[in-house]
């Protein structure tokens, strides 16, 4: 693992047009816009300090893993650095889903391409926000397509706690026939620090209802920590 950074390269990224806010929210409210702007500014300020904190924990605590294998063809974890790309390739990764905003992204799409990895970019604001149902569906289909080809997909956000968990849960719900509760417990048993914000839980439950309207899709949050 390395802590070197690299300028963002957005020219070759397959990117979602929306900003990751649920379409069910009210639109155009000045308070919501101010809140988003404030959280966005705070996220930029906190990005490198929190990234450094995670790196220190990774180096000092053996149980603090940068990524974890959730399913046969599915890895999820924290933001990768450039030197991680060859390691991911050796692990059989053929696709990467980035749920970070551009300022949080440390590996350009061109580098993934050089290692024959597809790169799906779904920019989603940190802390309080979730990908839309449309983007989650795109991500789930991407993971499933790679799995059918025997390729592993790496799903990541900044710390591998909230945004990436949202997508991974939805994949398990659709393609492994899990309930929301079962999917969450499965992921948490492998990566104990995962945590969903209420907006992320809501979109996972909505996705589950769309897959099976009669399915049970409620689970209890276990902590109020900041997520990413």
Swiss-Prot record:
GO terms for molecular function: phosphatidylglycerophosphatase activity; protein serine/threonine phosphatase activity; protein tyrosine phosphatase activity. Exhibits phosphatidylglycerophosphate phosphatase activity. Involved in root growth and columella cells organization. May possess protein phosphatase activity. It comes from Arabidopsis thaliana. Residues 1-10 have a biased composition (Acidic residues). The keyword Metal-binding does not apply. Substrate binds at residues 48, 126, 158-163. Disruption phenotype: No visible phenotype in the double mutant ptpmt1-1 ptpmt2-1. But plants lacking PTPMT1, PTPMT2 and PGPP1 have strongly shorter roots associated with a defective order of columella cells in the root apices, with stronger effect than in the single mutant pgpp1-1. The keyword rRNA-binding does not apply. GO terms for biological process: phosphatidylglycerol biosynthetic process; root development. It is an enzyme of class 3 (hydrolase). Pathway: Phospholipid metabolism; phosphatidylglycerol biosynthesis; phosphatidylglycerol from CDP-diacylglycerol: step 2/2. The active site is at 157 (phosphocysteine intermediate). Keywords: Hydrolase, Lipid biosynthesis, Lipid metabolism, Phospholipid biosynthesis, Phospholipid metabolism, Protein phosphatase. Belongs to the protein-tyrosine phosphatase family. Non-receptor class dual specificity subfamily. It catalyses: O-phospho-L-seryl-[protein] + H2O = L-seryl-[protein] + phosphate; O-phospho-L-threonyl-[protein] + H2O = L-threonyl-[protein] + phosphate; O-phospho-L-tyrosyl-[protein] + H2O = L-tyrosyl-[protein] + phosphate; a 1,2-diacyl-sn-glycero-3-phospho-(1'-sn-glycero-3'-phosphate) + H2O = a 1,2-diacyl-sn-glycero-3-phospho-(1'-sn-glycerol) + phosphate. A motif (Glucan phosphatase signature motif CXAGXGR) lies at residues 157-163. This is Phosphatidylglycerophosphate phosphatase PTPMT2. InterPro entries: Dual-sp_phosphatase_cat-dom, Prot-tyrosine_phosphatase-like, PTPMT1-like, Tyr_Pase_AS, Tyr_Pase_dom, TYR_PHOSPHATASE_DUAL_dom. The gene is PTPMT2. Coiled coil: none annotated. Its EC number is 3.1.3.27, 3.1.3.16, 3.1.3.48. Residues 1-30 are annotated as: Disordered. PROSITE patterns: TYR_PHOSPHATASE_1 (PS00383), TYR_PHOSPHATASE_2 (PS50056), TYR_PHOSPHATASE_DUAL (PS50054). CDD domains: PTPMT1. Pfam families: DSPc (PF00782).
């Amino acid at each position: 693992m390395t802590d070197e950074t690299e300028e963002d390269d957005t020219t070759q990224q397959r990117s979602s047009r929306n900003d990751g806010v649920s379409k069910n929210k009210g639109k155009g409210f000045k308070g919501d816009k101010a809140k988003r702007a404030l959280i966005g500014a705070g996220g930029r300020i906190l990005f490198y300090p929190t990234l450094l904190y995670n790196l220190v924990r990774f180096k000092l605590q053996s149980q603090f893993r940068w990524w974890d294998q959730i399913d046969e063809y599915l890895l999820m974890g924290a933001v990768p650095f450039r030197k991680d790309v060859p390691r991911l390739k050796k692990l059989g990764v053929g696709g990467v889903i980035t749920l970070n905003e551009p300022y949080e992204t440390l590996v350009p799409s061109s580098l993934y391409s050089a290692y024959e990895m597809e790169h799906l970019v779904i920019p989603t604001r940190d802390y309080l926000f979730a990908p839309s149902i449309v983007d989650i569906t795109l991500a789930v289909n991407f993971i499933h397509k790679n799995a059918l080809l025997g390729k592993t997909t790496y799903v990541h956000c900044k710390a591998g706690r909230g945004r990436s968990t949202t997508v991974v849960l939805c994949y398990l719900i659709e393609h492994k026939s899990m309930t929301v509760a079962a999917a969450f417990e499965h992921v948490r048993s492998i990566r104990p620090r995962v945590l969903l914000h209420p907006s992320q839980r809501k979109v996972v439950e909505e996705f589950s209802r769309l897959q099976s309207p009669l399915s049970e899709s409620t689970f209890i949050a276990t902590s109020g920590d900041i997520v990413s």
